[in-house]
């Protein structure tokens, strides 16, 4: 009875809501299917636009081309080697068996033939070398003319110099020190001290005049005091008399000036 009640579907508002939800879900699925179909079609169109050569096919084609080029190169090398062997066979003469020949005339003939062939080959070699040297000289002249027209000169062959030579040269050279004082003008400055020192040097004893005068007065005073005591006075030097008279003359002049 309970199972039958569960399977019974009642009408009304709830049934309409369930129908709308089912319909919306179905529409959503249809839209998804349409979008998926469009994307697949677009992917197919895009793959068609890329062309026939996909990256994998390009890689295979590149590999095949490399293999074909290697085979062609080997074949060309084989052909060149065959041509070389063919030309060598044509130009070289098979040597006769000299050991088995006892006839001297036949041996002499073989010698003359070989000598003539060697001479001919040497002449051809000289002609070829001469032609090559002439062409090289012409090429050099043309290159010089072209460089002259361009305004450029051929670079000379530079001599290889060790890097240590330059280092030793730079270390050996001593830089001259610039002394700016030598360029200055020398000006002689005379001060009062210099004048005084010059006057001192000009005197005989290197002492000022006023010190000489005081010394002369001191020498004259003890001589006058000692004159009555000593029976025989020592003769005074002639230079002392004018020295003693000088201060007296100066005192008289000062007194006259004061009186005036």
UniProtKB/Swiss-Prot annotation:
InterPro entries: Troponin (IPR001978), Troponin_I (IPR050875), Troponin_sf (IPR038077). GO terms for cellular component: myofibril; sarcomere; troponin complex. Residues 192-219 have a biased composition (Basic and acidic residues). Expressed in body wall muscle from first larval stage to adult. In adults expression is predominantly in vulval and anal muscles, body wall muscle expression is weaker. Also expressed in vulval muscles of hermaphrodites and the sex muscles of males. It comes from the Eukaryota. Residues 192-260 are annotated as: Disordered. Disruption phenotype: Worms exhibit abnormal muscle morphology, egg laying defects and constipation. Keywords: Actin-binding, Muscle protein. GO terms for biological process: egg-laying behavior; muscle contraction; post-embryonic body morphogenesis. Gene3D superfamilies: 1.20.5.350. Residues 231-260 have a biased composition (Acidic residues). Coiled coil: none annotated. The keyword Transferase does not apply. GO terms for molecular function: actin binding; troponin C binding. The keyword Secreted does not apply. Belongs to the troponin I family. Troponin I is the inhibitory subunit of troponin, the thin filament regulatory complex which confers calcium-sensitivity to muscle actomyosin ATPase activity. This is Troponin I 3.
């Amino acid at each position: 009875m309970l199972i039958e009640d569960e399977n019974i579907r009642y009408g009304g508002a709830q049934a309409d809501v369930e129908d709308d939800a089912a319909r919306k879900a179905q529409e959503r699925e249809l839209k998804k299917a349409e979008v998926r179909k469009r994307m697949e079609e677009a992917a197919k169109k895009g793959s068609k636009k890329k062309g026939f050569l996909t990256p994998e096919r390009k890689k295979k084609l590149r590999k095949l081309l490399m293999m074909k080029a290697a085979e062609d190169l080997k074949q060309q090398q084989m052909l060149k080697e065959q041509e070389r062997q063919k030309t060598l066979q044509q130009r070289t003469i098979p040597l006769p068996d000299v050991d088995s020949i006892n006839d001297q005339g036949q041996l002499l003939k073989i010698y003359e033939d070989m000598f003539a062939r060697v001479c001919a080959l040497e002449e051809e070699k000289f002609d070829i070398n001469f032609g090559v040297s002439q062409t090289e000289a012409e090429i050099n002249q043309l290159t010089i003319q072209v460089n002259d027209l361009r305004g450029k000169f051929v670079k000379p062959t530079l001599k290889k110099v060790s890097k240590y030579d330059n280092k030793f040269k730079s270390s050996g050279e001593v830089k001259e020190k610039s002394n700016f004082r030598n360029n200055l003008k020398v000006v002689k400055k005379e001060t009062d001290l210099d004048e005084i020192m010059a006057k001192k040097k000009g005197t005989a004893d290197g002492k000022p005049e006023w010190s000489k005068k005081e010394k002369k007065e001191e020498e004259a005073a003890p001589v006058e005091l000692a004159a009555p005591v000593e029976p025989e006075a020592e003769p005074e030097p002639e230079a002392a008399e004018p020295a003693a008279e000088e201060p007296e003359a100066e005192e008289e002049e000062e007194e006259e000036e004061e009186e005036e």
